[in-house]
Design a protein with these regions (language model features):
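Terminal substrate-recognition subdomain of acyl/acetyltransferases
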Residues: 10-36, 74-75, 79-176
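Negatively charged, low-complexity tracts enriched in Asp/Glu with abundant Ser/Thr
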Residues: 1-3, 7-8
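Conserved acetyl-CoA-binding loop-helix of GNAT-fold acetyltransferases
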Residues: 54-73
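Conserved acetyl-CoA binding element of GNAT-fold acetyltransferases
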Residues: 37-55, 86
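Short linear interaction motif-like sites in intrinsically disordered regions of transcription factors
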Residues: 3, 42, 95-98
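Generic marker of "main functional regions" within proteins
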Residues: 50-52, 71, 114
């Protein structure tokens, strides 16, 4: 697990549900979300063009902004049982799922120590499968070639069917 001192980050809430991250006063990433009952919905997470090309290999803006949000919500005392996001078929067309699915699958290792959550990742064919808790069996992430081949096929199937996929983390509290 990583430790974040969020006071070291230049982040701002654009509104109640949009967090923006800056590096040297340059806008680098944005995360939009909503709290819906017992679920935290990630409605948008992206790096700006500058954030994608910034010459700082020690910074992982997508990871950092997601972690900052979790710390912020934890400090506010927000409680949720799951974190849900949609993987748009448009992003699959741009081949983005090849990086976003592995990123979400391994995000647990970047969850800050101070956040009392353990996140268990699951991937779903579509929203109906998610609502029925019918996740897609995933190869182990450490089997990189098998995982990459799985993601490539999963992405192509969704492009052919022109449908979105969903991911979800079951949130387990590990300390109050």
């Amino acid at each position: 697990m990583w430790h974040y001192n969020i006071e070291d980050y230049d982040y701002r809430f654009h509104d109640d549900y949009t967090l923006q991250l800056y590096d040297n006063k340059r806008f680098v990433a944005e995360l939009s979300f909503r709290l819906d009952g017992k679920a935290l919905w990630i409605t948008n997470l992206y790096r700006t063009e500058y954030g994608k090309t910034a010459e700082n290999p020690d910074r992982h803006y997508g990871t950092e902004i997601f972690a900052i949000l979790l710390i912020h919500l934890f400090r506010k005392g927000e409680s949720f049982d799951s974190i849900i996001g949609r993987l748009s078929v448009q992003d699959a067309d741009w081949n983005n799922w090849m990086t976003s699915i592995p990123y979400y699958a391994k995000f647990q290792q970047y969850v800050p120590d101070e956040v009392g959550y353990r996140l268990n990742f699951a991937l779903f064919e579509d929203k109906a499968a998610m609502q029925q808790n019918q996740s897609v069996p995933l190869p182990a992430y450490k089997e990189k070639e098998a995982f990459r081949a799985f993601v490539a096929e999963f992405q192509q199937e969704h492009i052919r069917a022109c449908k979105d996929a969903y991911f979800c983390y079951a949130v387990e509290r590990i300390h109050p």
